[in-house]
A protein has these predicted regions:
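N-terminal Rossmann-like or analogous alpha/beta NTP/dinucleotide-binding catalytic cores
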Residues: 1-118, 213-226, 270
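Residue-level signal for inorganic ion chemistry
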Residues: 27, 58, 98, 102, ...
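Glycine-rich phosphate/pyrophosphate-binding loops
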Residues: 32-44, 190-203, 224-238, 451-457, ...
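Conserved phosphate-binding loops in nucleotide/dinucleotide-binding enzymes
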Residues: 81-85, 180-181, 199-210, 238-274, ...
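Active-site cores that bind ATP or allylic diphosphates and position pyrophosphate for catalysis
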Residues: 97, 105-249, 257, 282
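Residue-level detector of well-ordered alpha-helical segments, enriched
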Residues: 270, 314, 331, 349-356, ...
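Small-residue-rich helix-loop
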Residues: 328-430
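Charged substrate- and nucleic-acid-binding regions of tRNA-handling and nucleotidyl-transfer enzymes
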Residues: 416-478
Length: 479
């Protein structure tokens, strides 16, 4: 059996979209599941779109996602170089071989020439059958040229796709595509065929947008007498629009790149776990997987033909599940940079607050909004003191707050246990239920009905002076 070798071949043009991450992930997982190799290859043939530092960004993204190439730039391997701009001479050699075999030709048309809006609809093949003496004269005169693939004018080209089955295209619809540009650089459609063959790629896993190009690739394999690899074209990742419809995932749907999601506070492992299930179904009902577990069970048979819809709420769920597996210490250390503007007292007691937040946030990016009241206390409406469940009204709150404040003023050791003991003693002697007492205290301390932790935690984290000042403010608002 042929050794499984897959590749991820991005263009260095910017951030890594979720769809590209999924392509890399599936290639990696399929290789690992079959004890094969996963290659990283940089397709930088379009120098006009090249973004500085993009290659490092791609490598860093893969590293953060725990996708480790076996071969590629910076990873070693016997099939290098793994950057297409460094393989220029290789492509020219094979293009000239096609010319000699009659499967390609030099096109001397200038920019805009040789194209027609009717008939064929693309390049009209002006140079396809130029006499050799005309070609020689143009070459001698130094006229610039591109090299085009000579497509068959009749018949059909069929290829098998593991996801979509047999796909057939009429050859008459195929334009004589450019293989080598005037600057000597190959086009994507040519370079990737040469590289996939020379690097012994067994399975090409890529987006469905390349289905229309694949017949041209298959013909190139036939022209060279090479066995084509297996093709796996993945359906797109979609986003849900406001009207309920779906369209290809883009920035209007929210964050769409791996780096953006990480900046929002999603864990890389949660992102890759969720992205793996966007179009692939494992045989069990299990959803949370480690990379190692997915690398053991991933199969192409589990891939769907239908587009997957990116669901941010589902990603929140995955991230929450991963938070649960973290130790309180690890969560505290990782979450502190997302805390925003916090007081020194909160910072000093961050492990305590972080432990409360761990089960209350779906991602780190939600933390600042849940705790901003500690450092930035905003005014609130006294209507918040109403709570039917706990039988609290603003009038009732006006009775409770002064009494509770008096009790707290007598707490000399402002520790969690001392505060807790004092409040419980007050509740017991008052004859009121705990919720009845705690509700007005929570509102006066936080200015909001929902907080991480209970009233005792709020009192401790605010500190005695600030806590009593906020309760006094509540008393005055209710007067």
């Amino acid at each position: 059996m042929t050794k499984v070798r897959t590749r991820f071949a991005p263009s260095p043009t910017g951030y890594m979209h979720i769809g590209n991450l999924r392509t890399a992930l599936y290639g990696y997982l399929f290789a690992k599941a079959n004890h094969g190799d996963f290659l990283l290859r940089i397709e930088d043939t379009d120098q006009n779109r090249y973004v500085a530092d993009a290659v490092d960004f791609i490598k860093n993204t893969l590293a953060a996602a725990n996708i480790v190439p076996d071969e590629g730039p910076g990873f070693g391997g016997d099939c290098g170089p793994y950057v297409q701009s460094e393989r220029k001479d290789i492509y020219l050699k094979y293009a000239n071989e096609l010319i000699e075999k009659g499967f390609a030709y030099r096109c001397f048309c200038k920019e805009g020439e040789g194209h027609s809006a009717d008939g064929f609809g693309g390049y009209n093949r002006t140079c396809r059958d130029l006499p050799q003496d005309v070609i020689d004269a143009k070459l001698k005169a130094g006229e610039p040229f591109v090299i085009r693939q000579k497509m068959p004018l009749t018949g059909e080209t069929t290829f098998f796709d593991i996801v979509h089955g047999n796909i057939t295209i009429a050859n008459e619809t195929l334009e004589d595509q450019v293989l080598i540009k005037k600057d000597g650089m190959p086009t994507y459609n040519f370079a990737n065929v040469i590289d996939d063959h020379l690097m012994s790629i067994s399975h090409i896993i890529r987006g469905a947008e390349f289905i229309t190009s694949t017949p041209k690739h298959v013909l190139l394999y036939q022209f060279f007498g090479w066995e084509p690899p297996a093709f796996v074209h993945l359906p797109p990742v979609m986003g849900k629009n406001e009207d309920g419809s779906v369209s290809k995932l883009s920035k209007r749907h929210g964050a769409t790149s791996f780096s953006d999601l990480c900046e929002m506070g999603y864990l890389p492992a949660a992102i890759t776990n969720y992205v793996a299930l966007l179009g692939w179904s494992p045989k069990s009902n299990q959803e949370v997987f480690s990379m190692e577990e997915m690398g053991e069970i991933f199969s192409l048979e589990g891939l769907s033909k239908s587009p997957a819809v990116f669901n941010y709420a589902k990603l929140d769920w995955f991230n929450s599940e991963y938070f649960k597996t973290m130790s309180d210490e690890a969560f505290a250390a990782a979450s502190l940079p997302y805390a925003g503007n916090i007081t020194e007292r909160v910072k000093a007691n961050w492990p305590m607050l972080a432990a409360l937040l761990k089960t209350r946030v779906a991602r780190y990016g939600e933390i600042a909004g849940q705790i901003d009241f500690f450092a930035d206390f905003k005014d609130y409406d006294t209507a918040m003191f109403n709570n039917k469940k706990n039988k609290v009204t603003p009038e009732k709150a006006a009775e409770i707050l002064p009494a509770a404040k008096a009790v707290l003023e007598n707490v000399s050791d402002w520790s969690f246990s001392a505060i807790d003991t004092a409040l419980k003693a007050y509740i017991e002697t008052s004859g009121m239920k705990m919720g009845t007492v705690m509700w007005p205290l929570r509102i006066s301390l936080a200015g909001r009905p929902v907080t991480p932790g209970g009233v005792t935690e709020l009192l401790f984290l605010l500190g005695k002076d600030e806590a009593l000042a906020r309760i006094e403010n509540g008393i005055k608002k209710l007067a």
